[in-house]
């Protein structure tokens, strides 16, 4: 059907891969799709990382030991991505909660520092 997004039937928690990266769909924002990258095992961890349980990795087809980096990446569609599976509702809910918390942390970090007035005694 013309004008229909190729992602119209896809819901949050859907797992995709591109040539180099695995992705999980977190939400829709207007006409755009919000994805979070799924990273392979490494020593570098971030506060916004969620480990993917082995059963979820097996069910969704993503690499064992992977983790979700709760960092929003906007894409206009799923074009160029291959759907691999679906995370459970529980993991998807945890993803959304962690993503919202990370966005709040970033807002606080990016906010201008409060100015304190210093008054000399006397």
What are these regions (language model features)?
Residues 1-10:
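Mixed-charge, Lys/Arg-rich low-complexity intrinsically disordered regions
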Residues 12, 18, 24-58:
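Compact nucleic-acid interaction/catalytic patches
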Residues 56-122:
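C-terminal terminal-subdomain/extension
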Residues 2, 30, 42-44, 60, ...:
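Short, functionally important structural connectors and interaction interfaces within domains
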Residues 20-21, 68:
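Structural detector for hydrophobic anchor residues on beta-strands
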């Amino acid at each position: 059907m013309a004008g229909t997004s190729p992602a119209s039937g896809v819901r949050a928690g859907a797992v995709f891969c591109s040539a180099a990266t695995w992705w999980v769909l977190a939400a829709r924002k207007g006409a755009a799709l919000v994805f979070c990258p799924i990273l392979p095992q490494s020593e570098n961890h971030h506060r916004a990382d969620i480990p993917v349980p082995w059963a979820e990795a097996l069910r969704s087809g993503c690499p064992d030991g992977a983790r979700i980096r709760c960092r929003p990446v906007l894409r206009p569609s799923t074009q160029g991505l291959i759907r691999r599976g679906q995370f459970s509702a529980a993991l998807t809910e945890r993803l959304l909660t962690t993503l919202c918390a990370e966005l709040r942390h970033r807002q606080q970090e990016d906010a201008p520092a409060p100015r304190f007035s210093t008054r000399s005694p006397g």
